[in-house]
From Swiss-Prot:
Protein origin, superkingdom: Eukaryota
Its job: Might be related to the phospholipid scramblase and tubby-like superfamily of membrane tethered transcription factors.
Organism whose genome encodes this protein: Arabidopsis thaliana (Mouse-ear cress)
Upper lineage: Eukaryota, Viridiplantae, Streptophyta, Embryophyta, Tracheophyta
Family to which the UniProt record says this protein belongs: Belongs to the LOR family.
Protein name: Protein LURP-one-related 6
Length: 191
């Protein structure tokens, strides 16, 4: 898989990351991602920290912004059968550049499909989310049907779960998608 956000976050081997939800009352919500050594890799802040509904930020362990993700709004969005989220990374000059678009079906009787689709860059590169995120049982699958990441339940806890990423997968992209899933399902990044 080609890097979506940065090749700095791609690994040559499969990795298991642990996600810990932060309570809204303590840190404004969001979550922290650690590696197997319990070292912080990413922090995700939602509207409890940012103060803006429909906006998320993925940061590296040093607090540098990697992805700005926001929900599209406006009249066209209101008439659409999908909610649309856009993810932006920052180029070397600090300017935002579009990285991915995630579409999830709005909860309505007009929604034909329940699939969540992520489009990446120019061309027809896309990913789908299979399974149900709130149950901590879902996968991000590429257009060829290959699983690139899996969200799995951590036994006995809703606030901690694990994410297994396959080799050569951009973990910043994966956790950007997971941040949106967390928000869509009203979890730690939502207001």
């Amino acid at each position: 898989m080609k890097a979506v956000v940065s090749k700095l976050y791609c690994s040559s081997m499969e990795e298991v990351m642990v996600v810990r939800r932060r309570p809204h009352v303590v840190n404004g919500g969001g979550f922290v991602v650690t590696d197997y050594k319990e070292k912080i890799v990413f922090k995700i802040d939602g509207c409890g920290v940012l103060g803006t509904k429909g906006e998320l930020v993925l940061r590296d362990s040093d607090g540098n912004d990697l992805l700005l993700i926001h929900k599209k709004g406006g009249v066209v969005q209101a008439l659409s059968i999908h909610n649309k989220w856009k993810g932006y990374s920052y180029d070397y000059q600090g300017s935002p550049k579009p990285v991915f678009t995630l579409r999830d079906p709005k909860h309505s009787c007009f929604s034909i499909t329940s699939s969540i689709r992520i489009s990446v860059g120019p061309g027809n590169c896309y990913f789908d989310v299979k399974g149900y995120f709130p149950d901590r049982d879902c996968s991000i699958v590429d257009s060829k049907g290959n699983v690139i990441a899996q969200v799995k339940e951590w036994i006995g806890s809703r606030d901690i779960y694990k994410v297994v990423t396959k080799p050569s997968v951009d973990k910043a992209f994966v956790f950007g998608v997971i941040a949106v899933l967390d928000y869509i399902y009203g979890e730690s990044t939502s207001c």
